[in-house]
Amino acid sequence: MEIALDDHDDEDLQSGLTALVVTVVELLVEALEGEAVRRMESGSLSDAEIERLGSQLQALEAELDRLQADQDIEAAVDEFKDDLDHVLRDAITQMSEADSTPGFEPQHSADGDSGGGSA
């Protein structure tokens, strides 16, 4: 999915940005769900917390679905997710190939950082 800023079509720009924001929020919800499952399995959540968390995540997903339908951006959100999936798969493949390359050693800075920087 591309957002063409030089297109001067405000509706397309708004739709594209909305799809991007919804995609990011959906990915965050997926991460939250994974963390919730991890905490449930570890026993660190009470039954009431599990119920409340499940209800909140369900409500958030329903609102995201409604927003996608109202804005007619389902296909754009799916396209963003597919594009991100391809980027991640390519990055993982490249990292795996680099790790299996004989003589390859990641460069480290003087402070022990691998050069990735900090955010």
UniProtKB/Swiss-Prot annotation:
Main localization of the protein described in the UniProt heading: other
Pfam families on file: GvpK (PF05121)
GO biological process, one term: gas vesicle organization
Keyword tags: Gas vesicle, Plasmid
Role description: Proteins GvpF to GvpM might be involved in nucleating gas vesicle formation. Gas vesicles are hollow, gas filled proteinaceous nanostructures found in several microbial planktonic microorganisms. They allow positioning of halobacteria at the optimal depth for growth in the poorly aerated, shallow brine pools of their habitat.
Other comments on record: Encoded in a 14-gene locus called c-vac which produces cylindrical gas vesicles only in the stationary growth phase.
Family membership: Belongs to the gas vesicle GvpK family.
The protein, known as: Gas vesicle protein K2
Lineage: Archaea, Methanobacteriati, Methanobacteriota, Stenosarchaea group, Halobacteria
